[in-house]
């Protein structure tokens, strides 16, 4: 499932405030704003998806990336590929399969001799071979959470920008800490 989600945020109102500062101050405030907004989006997406799917936030945060394309634009990327079962928690062999974290995978097994905490496998057909690695698909829940957070991102961006502009103004008049 590879779909591009494009979010347009109108920042003209915010940039009007920044035009009152020097170009270097304006650029510094905007870059900090983009970076802090990315950190906020990363945390919120991880929190929302983790709450819905029970996948650990640590695993989800490693799948959110931010690219600063130019001085005035950035791109947030969320990897929606299925998560390997062994990344969901410490895999344990049970009578009926494997348990990893809060998830149970029926008819799955670990290769204890090769890698005790390694990949979890399941037969791909009725025969002995082939077998495949077990993965947990979370794309639908992840995309829905990302869309919800994207709707809130513009307001958060403006809030952070206001704080950063205030910091630059305080720095210019000598009151910054």
Language model feature labels by segment:
Residues 1-177:
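Short, Lys/Arg-rich flexible segments
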């Amino acid at each position: 499932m590879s779909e591009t989600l494009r979010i347009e945020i109108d920042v003209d109102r915010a940039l009007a405030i920044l035009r009152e500062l020097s170009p270097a101050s304006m650029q510094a405030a905007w870059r900090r704003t983009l970076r802090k907004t990315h950190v906020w989006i990363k945390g919120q997406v991880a929190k929302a998806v983790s709450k819905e799917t029970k996948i650990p936030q640590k695993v989800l945060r490693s799948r959110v990336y931010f690219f600063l394309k130019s001085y005035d634009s950035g791109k947030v990327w969320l990897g929606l590929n299925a998560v390997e079962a062994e990344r969901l928690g410490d895999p344990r062999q049970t009578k009926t399969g494997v348990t990893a974290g809060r998830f149970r995978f029926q008819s799955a097994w670990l290769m204890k001799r090769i890698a005790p905490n390694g990949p979890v496998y399941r037969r791909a057909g009725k025969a002995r071979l082939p077998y495949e690695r077990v993965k947990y698909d979370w794309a639908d829940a992840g995309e829905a959470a990302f869309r919800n957070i994207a709707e809130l991102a513009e307001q958060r961006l403006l809030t952070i920008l206001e704080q950063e502009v205030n910091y630059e103004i305080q720095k210019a008049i000598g009151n910054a800490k």
